[in-house]
Amino acid sequence: MMTQDYKLQVEAIKCGTVIDHIPAQIGFKLLSLFKLTATDQRITIGLNLPSKRSGRKDLIKIENTFLTEQQANQLAMYAPDATVNRIDNYEVVKKLTLSLPERIDAVLTCPNSNCISHNEPVDSSFTVKAQRGEISLKCKYCEKEFDHLTVLHAD
């Protein structure tokens, strides 16, 4: 009988949030988009980690910080199979089930360079639409609709 040693590839946290099963190559973008680094707390990032589910994954751990259900659901746009776990005393005390939000405000940038959201002091605002497995976002201001990946890569 063969034995295997399993060890954590990213250090455990005592208290905070773990966002696991993020698609590989998306972790840094999520940190930036959702301003997850706007904290003095320690953040641990694992990129291209092995995953039984998808081959490779990214992982984010934020100590002493807890995502609201609304914040977690906004992550579902780009990491629909991600898990968001609340950790207390090194144990998972709550698992958030992600679902697409109806709208995303003050996070994304409209890809339309003529949109007023670029030049006016307004927060971006998108309505989320899901049809036949495709996710699109409609800008509140210019009313143009974009594939969610187009918006993800807009800066």
UniProtKB/Swiss-Prot annotation:
Example of a GO biological process term: pyrimidine nucleotide biosynthetic process
Source taxon at top rank: Bacteria
GO cellular component, one term: aspartate carbamoyltransferase complex
Binding-site list for Zn(2+): 110, 115, 139, 142
Disulfide pairings: none
GO MF annotation, one: metal ion binding
Cofactor note: Binds 1 zinc ion per subunit.
Keywords linked to the UniProt accession: Metal-binding, Pyrimidine biosynthesis, Zinc
InterPro entries: Asp_carbamoyltransf_reg_N (IPR020545), Asp_carbamoylTrfase_reg (IPR002801), Asp_carbamoyltrfase_reg_C (IPR020542), Asp_carbatrfase_reg_C_sf (IPR036792), Asp_carbatrfase_reg_N_sf (IPR036793)
Alphabetical list of SUPFAM superfamilies matching this protein: Aspartate carbamoyltransferase, Regulatory-chain, C-terminal domain, Aspartate carbamoyltransferase, Regulatory-chain, N-terminal domain
Cofactor: Zn(2+)
Record text on subunit structure and interactions: Contains catalytic and regulatory chains.
Family according to the record: Belongs to the PyrI family.
Function: Involved in allosteric regulation of aspartate carbamoyltransferase.
PANTHER family linked: ASPARTATE CARBAMOYLTRANSFERASE REGULATORY CHAIN
Name the record gives this protein: Aspartate carbamoyltransferase regulatory chain
Lineage per the UniProt record: Bacteria, Pseudomonadati, Pseudomonadota, Gammaproteobacteria, Enterobacterales
